[in-house]
């Protein structure tokens, strides 16, 4: 684990009293775990903290808010004043104000505002981004980004450990549980490439502080509503292999969500399933939204999921990325674009692999 230096943040935390923490739309375990863990530590050093998200907390992460409720869903009648009044705003696990959705317009003039609604003035207070994704957008005062980190949760643990000798504070049982969830989920239960011995040492420390790995797994993965498995059946029925079975493609439509009695959040993890098949190096999952489409992509080795997502205006990590397409193309056109862009991403990976082989052969 590289040593990102958080010391420049210490005076900002020490000298201010009120903080807002937020993250991306449809928050995952890393976003929520990082927010809750960080908020709990800030409160332990006497700070006032509000955690405000655009989206509600998904059902399988609600246990993180016990015993103390933490996360508020954005309310336009209340929260703009909270944001303006805060001394500092922390944006975790995302580096684009657009992806903060409702709160984004209060952080950057570049964030979209729904048609017909007034454009508010962004806060003049410091905005701090802590994240591990590629290609940050300019809107914050300072960025603390480590794209080699397993998760934003890992970065929050490092921040707290660096700050404790100066600022004090404790990692409570609730904070430890939340930060463990952040790391566990964003490493794919410790199977993604950046997982190393330091990851396990950090998680061992969190277990010593009260994180419960058995309960965590059960709450995160074994609390699905009945509709999720019905939706999974539809997803697997849509499965197609392309490019000599190197790429897998799956899709779920709005009509299938309705029939299954499922929600959009119930598709979480579907994109990962094709990697159970030998030879798959790129998986693309397409979800029809009420207005547009959502793409999730995962890859293995030298195949860039990020490059694929960027062809649709998205972003992410090299091997895990996503995008939203706000234009409602019909399915046939979306699939055509997906396959064309996937072909290019696979071809680029093949060229990189061949260049690496040629370099080895040419080496003295």
Regions inferred by a protein language model and the residue ranges of each:
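Hydrophobic/aromatic beta-strand patches that form the interior of the parallel beta-sheet core
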Residues: 52, 90, 126-130, 142-145, ...
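Short glycine/serine/threonine-rich phosphate/pyrophosphate-binding segments
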Residues: 29-35, 97-101
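Hydrophobic helix-and-loop "lid/oligomerization" segment in the mid-to-C-terminal part
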Residues: 2-25, 33-65, 69, 73, ...
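Active-site cofactor/cluster-binding pocket
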Residues: 71-141
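Short glycine-rich anion-binding loops that position phosphate/pyrophosphate groups of nucleotides
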Residues: 25-27, 94-97, 133-135, 254-255, ...
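Glycine-rich, phosphate-binding/catalytic loops in enzymes
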Residues: 37-39, 106-109, 145-146, 201
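Short acidic, glycine/serine/threonine-rich loops at helix termini
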Residues: 33, 62-65, 102-103, 139-142, ...
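Short alpha-helices
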Residues: 125, 130-203
């Amino acid at each position: 684990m590289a040593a990102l230096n958080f010391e420049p943040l210490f005076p900002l935390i020490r000298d201010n009293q009120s903080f807002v923490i937020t993250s991306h739309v449809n928050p995952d375990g890393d976003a929520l775990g990082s927010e809750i863990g960080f908020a709990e530590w800030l409160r332990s050093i006497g700070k006032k903290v509000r955690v405000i998200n655009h989206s509600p907390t998904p059902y399988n992460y609600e246990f993180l808010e016990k015993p103390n409720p933490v996360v508020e869903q954005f309310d336009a009648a209340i929260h703009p004043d909270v944001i303006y009044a805060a001394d500092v705003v922390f944006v975790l696990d995302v580096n684009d104000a657009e992806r903060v959705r409702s709160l984004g317009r209060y952080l950057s003039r570049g964030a979209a505002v729904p048609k017909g609604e007034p454009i508010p003035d962004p806060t003049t207070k410091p905005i701090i981004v802590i994240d591990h994704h590629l290609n940050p957008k300019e809107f914050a005062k300072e960025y603390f980004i480590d794209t080699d980190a397993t998760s934003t949760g890992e970065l929050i643990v490092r921040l707290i450990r660096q700050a404790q000798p100066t600022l004090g504070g404790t990692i409570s049982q609730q904070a430890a549980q939340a930060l463990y969830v952040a790391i566990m989920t964003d490493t794919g239960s410790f199977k993604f490439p950046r997982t190393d011995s330091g990851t396990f040492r950090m998680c061992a420390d969190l277990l010593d502080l009260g994180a419960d790995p058995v309960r965590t797994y059960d709450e995160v993965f074994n609390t699905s509503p009945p509709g999720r498995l019905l939706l999974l059946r539809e997803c697997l029925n849509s499965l197609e292999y392309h490019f000599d079975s190197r790429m897998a493609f799956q899709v779920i439509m709005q009509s299938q969500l309705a029939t299954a009695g499922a929600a959009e959040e119930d598709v979480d993890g579907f994109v990962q399933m094709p990697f159970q098949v030998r030879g798959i190096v790129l998986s693309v999952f397409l979800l029809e939204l009420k207005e547009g489409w959502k793409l999730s992509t995962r890859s293995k080795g030298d195949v860039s999921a990020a490059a694929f997502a960027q062809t649709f205006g998205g972003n992410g990590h090299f091997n895990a990325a996503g995008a939203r397409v706000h234009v409602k193309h019909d399915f046939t056109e979306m699939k055509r674009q997906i396959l064309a862009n996937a072909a290019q991403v696979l071809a680029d990976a093949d060229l990189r692999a061949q260049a690496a082989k040629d370099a080895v052969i040419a080496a003295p």
